[in-house]
Amino acid sequence: KAYFEVAGIILRENVHMGVIYIQGEQLWGEKLPRLATIYLLVLKLIYDEQMQTASSSSHVVTTLGAVNGKAGEFHVLKSLPSITEMRRTIALLKKYQIIEPLDVLEELNEATRLVIYPCIHTVLLGDDIRELLATFSEEDQIGDEAAIQSTLEDMPE
């Protein structure tokens, strides 16, 4: 702990969630692609929903179809992402040990099972997620309205 404190980093342990993580003002990770951000938000919601039901396990299993379906419910995905984009996103989230695919990534489909680890709690709080999902929806609506307005302006009289 003292080693990290010299650099302004705090080592945190949450026994209840079963995670150890570092925190500090100087810590900035890489910028996540849009799909990774959407998946992260949706995975957190799925995790919270499934943990509300009496579960003795600390991790949750879901499918890629459920993740894409939930993203569709919140209108944050206009269409199904490409297989390549989904593979990259799953690999990125696996790199940070947020999820673990139970099936081979080369055979990616809607039935592909994903384990969501408890460390998803350290990424965002539930209320933050709902705000971000609303922001994604507003951005899409503004984009759609701008496209409609642009189309209307381009129409001959």
Regions found by a protein language model. Give the residues of each.
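Long, compositionally biased intrinsically disordered regions
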Residues: M155-E157
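Accessory beta->alpha helical hairpin/"wing" motif in late/C-terminal subdomains of nucleic-acid enzymes
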Residues: V19-G24, E100-D127
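Short amphipathic alpha-helical interaction segments
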Residues: K1, K78-K95
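Short acidic, hydrophobic short linear motifs in intrinsically disordered regions
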Residues: A54-G72
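Eukaryotic partner-binding/assembly regions in large regulatory complexes
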Residues: K1-Q26
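Positively charged, polyanion-binding regions of nucleic-acid-associated proteins
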Residues: P33-S58
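Short, amphipathic alpha-helical interaction segments positioned at domain boundaries
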Residues: V115-L152
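A short, conserved structural fragment
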Residues: E5-E13, I90, K94-E106
